[in-house]
Amino acid sequence: MALPIAELRDRFLALQREIVSSLEAFDGEPFHTDAWSRPAGDRLQGDGLTRLIENGRFFERGGCNFSHVRGASLPPSATAHRQELAGRPFEALGVSLVLHPRNPYCPTVHLNVRFFVAHSNDTQPDVWWFGGGMDLTPYYPFVEDIVHFHRTCRDAVHAGGGDDTCYREWKTWCDRYFFLKHRNEPRGVGGLFFDDLGADGNTPFDAAQRLTFAVGDHFLPAYLPIVARRRPRPPAFVVDGLVTVERGHRGRVGPPVGGHLDDMPEDHLVRGSPRRRVERHRTRDGIVVGTGHHLHPLMQRQRTGAGTRAQP
């Protein structure tokens, strides 16, 4: 079967356009565009479209990038777990996204959807697979945001023809893949991660393609409602300090100059860090969060009904 590379390219570019258009409408600032290409004779040939935002009204920095590259020979280092593919011509294309909001109540997010093929040689056919996923990294997490993200991830798997077993496998894979062993903690609250979809020959091309693009198509429904809910900006010292705390794991020991102690988030007064462990939490429809993730005290009071402090 001839692989529909041109069709895949068009679909990845359409996904990039849709995401960037929606994010520009949300932020109010345009993404910068950089079209690039690799000339003939380079080890890697191909082209791509880089879309970047920096110092936006809402997003401090982010990128949504498309690339389509080809090579004449897969190096052995790239085929450690598939040594039989070494030396074969290859092709890879996909979309990758990272967004860092200014507001620490809004999480950083990552999305990647991709396709890879090691082309046929004299004796072997094409070997192809899809991969990707999306995951959320809150600085100041809220249970309802995490549940919404995971629920939409599950909806993506269902929309692509997958079942609950597939969803649980990809969710668990994401938790393992983004676990920081040197800190003995997860990076963020997870989401979906998958790779080698179709490589075993048990998943037809159309089914693997449908699942992969369902994940990409559910990125905006998974993320935009969260940032819209958390769009109002917190006090300036929270923006300046809390992002630094979570990006560098360094706390502050008191209010900023000119600040008032009553304005300090409770967690800063207690420990100088907003990090708390999330106990395991399962919703009625089976969404599980909290396998070692961190939960802010405001969320703990919300869960238990204690306290009356308003949420941001």
Task: Give each language-model segment a name.
Residues 255, 262-265, 270-274, 283, ...:
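Short linear motifs in low-complexity or flexible loops
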Residues 18, 72, 101-105, 115-119, ...:
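Short loop/turn segments at secondary-structure transitions that flank enzyme active sites
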Residues 48-130:
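Internal mixed beta-strand/loop scaffold within catalytic domains of large alpha/beta enzymes
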Residues 121-240, 245-250:
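Long, contiguous internal "core" modules enriched in hydrophobic/ aromatic residues
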Residues 237, 241-242, 252, 258-259, ...:
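Charge-rich, low-complexity intrinsically disordered segments
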Residues 90-113, 191, 222, 226, ...:
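Amphipathic alpha-helical packing elements
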Residues 279, 288-290:
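Residues marking helix boundaries in flexible regions
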Residues 2-82, 204-251:
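Gly/Pro-rich turn-and-neighbor structural signature
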